[in-house]
Regions:
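N-terminal helix-turn-helix DNA-binding core of bacterial DNA-binding proteins
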Residues: 24-69, 154
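N-terminal leader segment of winged-helix/HTH proteins
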Residues: 1-34, 81
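C-terminal regulatory/oligomerization modules of transcriptional regulators
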Residues: 1-4, 129-161
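Alpha-helical linker/hinge and terminal dimerization helices associated
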Residues: 22, 26-29, 64, 107-126, ...
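Charged, amphipathic alpha-helical coiled-coil/dimerization segments
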Residues: 76-134
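Short, hydrophobic-biased segments on the C-terminal half of alpha helices
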Residues: 57, 75-76
Length: 161
């Protein structure tokens, strides 16, 4: 397999460093404002935006690109904190339905203004409208290409020999 071209390598490292810096800043803000990890905040934010403020565990795992076991652990922590509830889906006994509680909605509302400020400051303020349009188009194509692969929540585990 051929090595990456220098411009590909530069782009890859710039992307990874930018994502890492943004993720670190967002993680710090979410912890300071809401005493949650970024993954926990993502789960609550997705539930807050979902129809009827609920999703199945599988939909949550696919939406946040997180393993089933990791999601089960995070959901347990959020449920213990009173931020979500979990119940068997009335439509499919095999599915677990996750619903955000009033306390969960309040926590998202407390975190969101600072979260928006961090994202705007670090990601969007340095970009022109044209830059934003170009970046959005590129990242949308890359995301769609990656999402065309089977979601991790349905991937089978590889057995060790």
């Amino acid at each position: 397999m051929a090595a990456l071209e220098p411009e590909q390598l530069d782009t890859y490292f710039a992307l990874m460093e930018s994502v890492s810096l943004l993720h670190h800043a967002v993680e710090q803000q979410v912890r300071a404002a809401g005493e949650l990890s970024y993954v926990q905040f993502q789960l609550l934010a997705r539930l807050a935006d979902a129809p009827d403020r609920q999703l199945t565990m599988t939909a949550l795992a696919d939406g946040v690109v997180y393993s089933r076991s990791g999601l089960t652990h995070q959901a347990g922590l959020l449920e213990k904190a009173g931020l979500i509830t979990r119940a068997t889906s009335p439509d499919d006994q095999r599915a677990t339905l996750v619903t955000i509680t009033r306390a969960g909605l309040d926590r998202v509302a407390a975190i969101l203004p600072g979260h928006v400020d961090v994202v705007r400051d670090l990601l969007f303020d340095p970009l022109s409208k044209k830059d934003l349009d170009v970046l959005g188009g590129i990242m949308g194509r890359v995301r769609d290409h990656m999402r065309a692969q089977p979601p991790r929540s349905v991937s089978t585990r590889k057995r060790r020999a």
